[in-house]
């Protein structure tokens, strides 16, 4: 099967968030499973020079951008047995950051149109074009309007994946005239609430639509989660499905991870205790093996559940024998709160400002319990990494958390969960974990089940292959 995977970022070339992790892992797994999956991304100025040195020039052409044509250079490279294509235009992409520019709508309208224009030049006729988030949402729109009836482009199916429905590519209608270039007779495809909405256009015109977890696919049909797109998604519910993301189980492997204080496995967990002791020492926490250590690695923003933590952590620290560490940065109100808590509970609570990947791995491996009380969570990777390292997650049953963490009350459980977005419910779930850790044998079995959880990309990739095959049957 021939798949063109379109994304605005992909590791190791360019990345600013979770999409880069997905685009850097899923296509490679698909290739290992025998699929011809190729990736296309912008040629950003931020791509490291050593990676640019591996690129080869193919050709250049012009791309329609509303009423004008813009230069497009096309490059390719091989990386980890996958073919990458790079769309080049220095005016659009040679900038210090990937996003946040005044002309992002124009930049990614150009990118979306260039993806379709490049296909004859690379002599690659994909069976499926897989688009991701609003930055490539115009690809199925442009295909439907301008390319589907051209002989070379016949019978190409499209899949549009929503990684976070909050970011929809919503702009005023002047953007259509200057950047997007949809005929006036067809603007209803992109219209929502009087504005131009790129994600809405993709939902309407793509062959299929997916999200990054089954529960999130169900949730975004509800007004509470949809950010206004529930009517569109309910109208086209038949094309919507959810596939849970995976993690790189080769990188996140407690048996071989060189960044851990000591390696361990599900069959020999003795090294995990040393990871905890060394982490406590590094963070100036009391070195007590018998005191449960609760960890968080997160952005400090409200939708990650930080308002619940702010309401309930002080009471937990006062009434329970526990330690707490959090690594992250974000809203100042939460940063100030954790600085206050660190001063109030010296030796028991540590706030590590910023994000240090090496320290994050040490928290995943050294903590006993991992807290993730999100208000919304399309998929989430942190809970799956914690499971991989045998650190028991306490999560709210929402989105991908609900699909990957199952309460220990069930025989197959691998963590502790709560449903309502309430401080008392979160506190009870944490207390249940603190009570559970006192049962050494039961906790060891829970850790074993956690480490046995299959959150690999192999499983997710097979689900995507099944979805691709099903999509090819659609008219």
Model-derived features with residue positions:
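Catalytic cores of nucleotide-sugar-dependent glycosyltransferases that transfer UDP/GDP/TDP-activated
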Residues: 1-475
């Amino acid at each position: 099967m021939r798949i063109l995977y379109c994304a605005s970022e992909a590791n190791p070339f360019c990345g600013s968030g979770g999409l880069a992790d997905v685009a850097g892992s899923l296509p490679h797994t698909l290739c290992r499973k025998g699929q011809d999956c190729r990736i296309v991304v912008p040629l950003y100025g931020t791509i490291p020079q050593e990676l640019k040195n591996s690129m080869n020039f193919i050709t250049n052409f012009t791309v329609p951008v509303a009423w004008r044509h813009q230069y497009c250079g096309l490059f390719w490279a091989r990386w980890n047995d996958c073919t990458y294509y790079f769309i080049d235009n220095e005016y659009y992409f040679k900038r210090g950051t990937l996003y946040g520019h005044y002309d992002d709508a124009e930049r990614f309208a150009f990118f979306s149109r260039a993806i379709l224009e490049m296909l004859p030049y690379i002599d690659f006729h994909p069976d499926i074009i897989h688009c991701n988030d609003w930055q490539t949402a115009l690809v199925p729109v442009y295909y439907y309007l301008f390319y589907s009836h051209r002989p070379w482009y016949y019978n190409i199916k499209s899949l549009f994946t929503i990684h976070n429905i909050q970011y929809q590519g919503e702009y005023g209608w002047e953007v259509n005239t200057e950047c997007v270039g949809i005929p006036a007779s067809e603007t209803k495809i992109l219209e929502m609430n009087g504005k131009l909405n790129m994600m809405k256009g993709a939902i309407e015109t793509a062959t299929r639509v997916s999200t990054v977890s089954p529960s999130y696919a169900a949730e975004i049909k509800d007004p509470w989660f949809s950010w206004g797109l529930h009517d569109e998604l309910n109208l086209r519910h038949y094309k919507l499905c959810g596939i849970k993301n995976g993690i790189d189980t080769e990188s996140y492997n407690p048996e071989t991870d060189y960044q851990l204080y000591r390696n361990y496995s599900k069959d020999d967990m003795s090294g995990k205790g040393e990871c905890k002791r060394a982490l406590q020492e590094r963070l100036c926490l009391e070195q007590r093996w018998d005191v449960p250590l609760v960890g968080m690695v997160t952005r400090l923003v409200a939708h990650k559940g930080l308002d619940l933590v702010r309401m309930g952590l002080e009471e937990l620290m006062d009434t329970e024998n526990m330690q707490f560490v959090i690594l992250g940065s974000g809203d100042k109100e939460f940063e100030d709160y954790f600085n206050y808590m660190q001063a109030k509970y010296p030796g028991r609570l540590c706030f590590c400002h910023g994000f240090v990947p090496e320290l994050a791995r040490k928290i995943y491996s050294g903590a006993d319990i991992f807290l993730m009380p999100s208000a919304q969570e399309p998929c989430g990777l942190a809970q799956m990494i914690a499971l991989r390292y045998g650190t028991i997650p306490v999560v709210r049953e929402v989105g991908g958390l609900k699909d990957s963490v199952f309460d220990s009350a069930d025989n197959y459980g691998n963590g502790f969960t709560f449903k309502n977005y309430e401080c008392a419910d979160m506190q009870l779930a944490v207390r249940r974990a603190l009570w559970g850790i006192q049962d050494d044998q039961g906790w060891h079995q829970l850790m074993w089940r956690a480490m046995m959880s299959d959150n690999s990309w192999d499983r997710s990739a097979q689900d995507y292959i099944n979805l691709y095959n099903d999509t090819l049957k659609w008219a």
